[in-house]
């Protein structure tokens, strides 16, 4: 579960991989316990970090690649997170372009509360069955969902919800879940019931929806709460808001954060509306704290080496 385990596994890599393949083929493979460590976050909170066994990581990588090949043709253009050749930078660029168009006047900024730990296993498996009829393949995924979590105090927890902690397969499973829960629903149902322009930009469980009309945004938000509840999810109220966001109302000085950037309307030197974007204050503060800790740790190094590390 650590660097030493990886080195030991690599010493007999071919033999270990062959043994793993044989276990999968014979149906004797068992997912190992996932070691969970707690990492400090800004503000004194802790976040869990799952560390799967090396063999499980390798097998999950193979399964993730297969899922990617199946679902990339299904995923919609509004989904940006954890996809090949699609980055957070593209999400920011596309969102900026849409907002600059002037078609939208209201923004719903939303985040799903504890999303990765709240995914319903049975509902996720039902979604996978829609596209995959290979029972042994699906059984592998079920094993990882149910794999025990080993706490640092020796306690073993068997999760009833959520994607595999620290698992390579977790991001694409999360995308598949929200593809059905949010993306398709937004494009097929929400769009049909709105009277104006609408737009969705989602990166994992963080998303922004833009609307031409306030009444559409208000109806959407009410429907969103009900929709998420059907799948065992809820919005994080402290990270969710409905705001007027229009080039026609620059004086409102409204703003929202998405993927580490703050968006707001302002005016240029000629007094014309302009969409402004800058690093969000929370993101900047976190980066400064991280840099300060790094600098204190390395301040004793010679300047030449220190500057090389900074570059």
Q: For each predicted feature, which ranges?
A:
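Hydrophobic alpha-helical hairpins/lids featuring a short glycine-rich hinge
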Residues: 49-66, 73
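Non-catalytic, polymerase-adjacent accessory regions of viral genome-replication enzymes
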Residues: 1-13
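A conserved non-catalytic segment of reverse transcriptases
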Residues: 146, 235-305, 309
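Conserved polymerase palm-domain catalytic core
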Residues: 16, 23-27, 32-33, 37, ...
């Amino acid at each position: 579960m650590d660097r030493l385990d990886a080195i030991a596994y690599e010493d007999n890599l071919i033999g270990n991989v062959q043994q793993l393949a044989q276990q999968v083929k014979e149906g004797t493979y068992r997912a190992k316990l996932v070691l969970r460590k707690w990492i400090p976050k800004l503000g004194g909170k802790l976040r869990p970090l799952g560390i799967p066994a090396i063999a499980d990581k390798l097998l999950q990588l193979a399964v993730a690649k297969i899922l990617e090949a199946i679902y990339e043709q299904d995923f919609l253009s509004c989904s940006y997170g954890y996809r090949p050749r699609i980055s957070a930078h593209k999400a920011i660029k596309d969102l900026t372009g849409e907002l600059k168009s002037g078609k939208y006047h209201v923004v719903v900024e939303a985040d799903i509360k504890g999303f990765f730990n709240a995914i319903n296993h049975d509902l996720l498996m039902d979604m996978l069955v829609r596209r995959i009829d290979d029972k042994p393949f699906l059984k592998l995924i079920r094993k990882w969902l149910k794999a025990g979590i080993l706490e640092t105090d020796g306690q073993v927890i068997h999760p009833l919800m959520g994607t595999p902690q620290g698992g390579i397969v977790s991001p694409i499973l999360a995308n598949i879940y929200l593809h059905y829960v949010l993306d398709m629903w937004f494009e097929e149902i929400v769009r049909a019931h709105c009277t104006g322009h609408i737009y969705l930009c989602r990166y994992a469980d963080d998303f922004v929806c833009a609307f031409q009309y306030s009444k559409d945004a208000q109806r959407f938000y009410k429907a969103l709460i009900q929709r998420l509840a059907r799948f065992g999810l809820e919005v994080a109220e402290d990270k969710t808001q409905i705001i007027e966001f229009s080039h026609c109302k620059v004086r409102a000085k409204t703003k929202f954060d998405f993927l580490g950037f703050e968006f707001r309307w302002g005016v240029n030197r000629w007094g014309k509306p302009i969409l402004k974007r800058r690093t969000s204050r929370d993101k900047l503060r976190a980066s400064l704290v991280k840099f300060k800790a790094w600098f204190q740790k390395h301040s004793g190094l010679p300047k030449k080496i220190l500057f090389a590390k900074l570059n």
